[in-house]
Design a protein with these regions (language model features):
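Extracellular, repeat-based ectodomains that mediate carbohydrate processing or recognition
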Residues: 18-426
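Secretory targeting and sorting signals
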Residues: 1-18
Length: 426
């Protein structure tokens, strides 16, 4: 039974054994221990064995005289489904001279194999888009989309299967904006404001349903500085001309991050969304019921994006963070990864669960971060800090999962170091 969002309450929780027993390779480091890689993400080609990973490479620059980004977006490709990887390539190094830094990478692949990358070229112009036609070896000059905005942050990218329709959302410190392109990212509409309330919305995931409706999953932070956070969905059914916002749930004020240099909203609620081949939507989000308390991971499902099921509890152990969700090849098949510290305050791990019945029940959690050594920030209990604002998950046409996440000893803005780790499996 589908319930209107406003009436949805916790009626049941996910049960174990909703999917076949998974099997993953051991986690592997992207690059080396000397690399300081933050904000990893990944995508898989829908019609080939190519897989891509992107990272924010802290302190990495392509110019010998240091006049191009000192923190740069890098991408690498695998032509054999993650069996081997090519070199990490600067998406816009020397081509972005006099750009101070780059953060927040996003990746997507069109049906013809074109790879789309979006990221921040500082806060102004903010989000830019580039494409690769040769599996990430070279990239086009970045296209801006900020319009009259002088600041934007936290981009989320989605594309239609052909790549013709490109949508991004980002915030400008106070409000959320979305842009659309219907010429394969060559040009973009003026930014459209999607909210008019007392919250600054940050997006963590998006999807395009088979009928073309675009969805972005977001959480709101009070412009006043403290208070409950609405867990929100913004959608467009007219190609990005107009947007409708729905509050799915509300989370209490988040836990405080006490690491040196950590920003106040690091442990805020997050939300993400995926759609399958039938148009079924699964919305995954983090929720705390007590100010400063740990966040649990929940999902809600919908057949139309308007009416949503009651929440299904996926994880209530420790403080959940960094959720990422992706649909599998079959209808009703969704995969979910997240990080939590169930093993101790400074013992973070990455976990995986799957549903094959559209989100009604979920498999038992499987630990992906299985190495208890190999980096100074790792122990058998987990890593010291979830290094990076996001993680990533992609599923290829054979049903293989590709997950990537961050591990470290603190936040990069406070001098912490760490790396990006990944695994694959079914």
């Amino acid at each position: 039974m589908l319930l209107p969002v406003v009436a949805a309450v916790a009626l049941f929780t996910g049960a174990a054994s909703a999917a076949p027993q998974p099997s993953f390779t051991g986690e592997q480091l992207v690059g080396t221990l000397s690399d300081d890689f933050w904000e990893p993400t990944t995508t898989a080609d829908p019609h080939s064995s190519y897989v891509y990973q992107a990272v924010t490479a802290i302190g990495s620059h392509e110019c010998t005289n240091h006049n191009c980004p000192g923190t740069s977006i890098k991408v690498r490709a695998s032509s054999d489904g993650g069996g081997s990887w090519g070199p990490l390539v600067f998406v816009c190094g020397t081509a972005c001279k006099n750009v101070g830094w780059q953060f927040d990478p996003q990746l997507a692949v069109a049906s013809d194999g074109t790879v789309y990358a979006a990221w921040l070229n500082t806060f102004n112009p903010g989000t830019v888009l580039s494409k690769s036609f040769d599996h990430g070896k070279t990239w086009t000059a970045p296209v801006t989309m900020n319009g009259d905005l002088s600041y934007n942050d936290k981009p989320t990218l989605v594309i239609s299967p052909s790549g013709r329709d490109v949508y991004l959302t980002f915030d400008d410190k106070t409000d959320d904006y979305s842009v659309a392109s219907h010429d394969y990212g060559a040009s973009f509409s003026a930014p459209v404001q999607t909210n008019s309330d007392a919250y600054e919305y940050l997006s963590y995931g998006g999807t395009i349903a088979p009928n073309g409706t675009v969805y972005f999953a977001q959480t709101g932070e009070p412009k006043s500085g403290a208070g409950d956070e609405p867990v929100s969905l913004v959608r467009s059914a007219d190609g990005g001309t107009t947007w409708t916002r729905t509050t799915i749930d509300t989370s209490a004020e988040p836990p405080v991050c006490t690491f040196k240099g950590c920003y106040a909203d690091f442990y805020s609620s997050q939300a993400t969304i995926a759609s399958d081949s039938s148009g079924k939507l699964v919305f995954a989000y983090l929720k705390s019921t007590v100010d400063g308390g740990p966040k649990s991971l929940h999902v809600r499902t919908s057949a139309n994006g308007t009416n949503w099921s009651a929440p299904v509890l996926v994880n209530a152990r420790g403080d959940s963070d960094m959720p990422a969700i992706a649909a599998g090849p079959a209808a009703g098949d969704f995969r979910l990864v997240w990080q939590d510290n169930r093993n101790g305050v400074n013992a973070w791990n990455t976990w995986y669960a799957r549903t094959t019945n559209g989100g009604a029940t979920w498999s038992a959690a499987v630990r992906l971060s299985n190495l208890g050594s190999g980096a100074p920030y790792k122990t058998t209990a987990g890593c010291t800090f979830p290094f990076g604002d996001y993680g990533g998950l992609a599923v290829d046409s054979t049903g293989t999962n590709f997950a990537v996440w961050g591990e470290g000893d603190g936040i990069c803005t406070g001098g912490g170091t760490g790396g990006s780790w990944w695994t694959r499996g079914r």
